[in-house]
């Protein structure tokens, strides 16, 4: 039997000797960086919108299995550690605990993908919704400069050895009208106006592209200022309720 006793909590009566398998539906029609989205063109989710938290098991390792729809040619991008995946990225993933599981969003679809290294660290950039005239090489080169500058700002002496991640992923959703970002431990989810992307033969940076680079810089800086250096209230998240702090003036203001 399953019964709900809180807005975010359910109790299940089950036998200890038997495996428990749950099937449930989730809302996936929020085309932002916050929750989840799924249609015939693209899929995206934060673990907090899909993955239930088992009380008392938050510190245990968590596995995630991702299966492609029959006939799909989608690919997968995420910062979560893969265990056994195919060329498209579908398969098995592993998180060391629940916090890591829900702090690694997934992007799925026929997106544009590019790679670069910053201070010797692999970085990946994927974009859903990019137009044909998009200049990927320009975006990668400019983003690389941003990343190297910020890594050296935080780790001047040993940037490669001291960076808080071994690989980083940018996930950008280019839409008709939108703007925003959400930082994660080794990735960031971004949304921008499609017209803000750099185009081939663009001689001068457009105002929109400058705004996009500012967003990229801001969210990447949060890798340290929020994800590493953070309020005491965020040391251990309480997923049953809102988590408040009076220090956003610093964590958002200083980052900007």
Predicted segments — roles?
Residues 115-247:
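Juxtacatalytic substrate-recognition/specificity segment
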Residues 1-38:
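A surface-exposed beta-strand-loop module
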Residues 13-25, 86-110:
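C-terminal beta-strand-rich structural cap/linker in extracellular carbohydrate-active enzymes
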Residues 26-28, 68-70, 80, 129, ...:
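A mature extracytoplasmic/lumenal domain signature
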Residues 1, 18, 49-51, 59-77, ...:
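Zn2+-dependent metallopeptidase catalytic core
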Residues 244-256:
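Metalloprotease/metallohydrolase-associated module, dominated by Zn2+-dependent proteases
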Residues 26-62:
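Glycine/proline-rich low-complexity spacer/linker segments in large multi-domain proteins
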Residues 79-87:
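Short, solvent-exposed aromatic-acidic interface loops
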């Amino acid at each position: 039997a399953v019964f709900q006793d809180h807005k975010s909590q359910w109790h299940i009566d089950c036998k200890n000797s038997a495996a428990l398998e749950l099937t449930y539906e989730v809302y996936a029609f929020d085309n932002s960086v916050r929750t989840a989205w799924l249609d015939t063109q693209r899929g995206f989710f934060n673990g907090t919108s899909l993955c239930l938290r088992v009380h008392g098991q938050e510190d245990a390792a968590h596995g995630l299995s991702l299966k492609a729809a029959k006939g799909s040619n989608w690919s997968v991008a995420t910062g979560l550690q893969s265990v056994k995946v195919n060329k498209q990225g579908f398969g098995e993933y592993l998180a060391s605990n629940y916090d890591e599981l829900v702090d690694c969003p997934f992007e799925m679809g026929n997106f544009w993908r590019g790679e670069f290294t910053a201070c010797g660290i692999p970085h990946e950039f994927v974009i859903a919704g990019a137009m044909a005239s998009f200049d990927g090489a320009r975006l990668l080169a400019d983003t690389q400069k941003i990343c190297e500058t910020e890594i050296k700002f935080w780790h001047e002496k040993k940037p490669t050895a001291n960076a808080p991640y071994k690989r980083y992923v940018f996930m950008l959703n280019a839409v008709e009208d939108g703007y925003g970002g959400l930082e994660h431990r080794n990735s960031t989810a971004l949304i921008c106006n499609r017209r803000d992307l750099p185009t081939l033969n663009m001689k001068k940076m457009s105002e929109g592209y400058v705004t996009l680079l500012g967003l990229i810089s801001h969210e990447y800086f949060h890798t340290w200022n929020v994800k590493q250096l953070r309020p005491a209230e965020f040391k251990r998240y309480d997923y049953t309720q809102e988590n408040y702090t009076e220090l956003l003036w610093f964590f958002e203001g200083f980052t900007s």
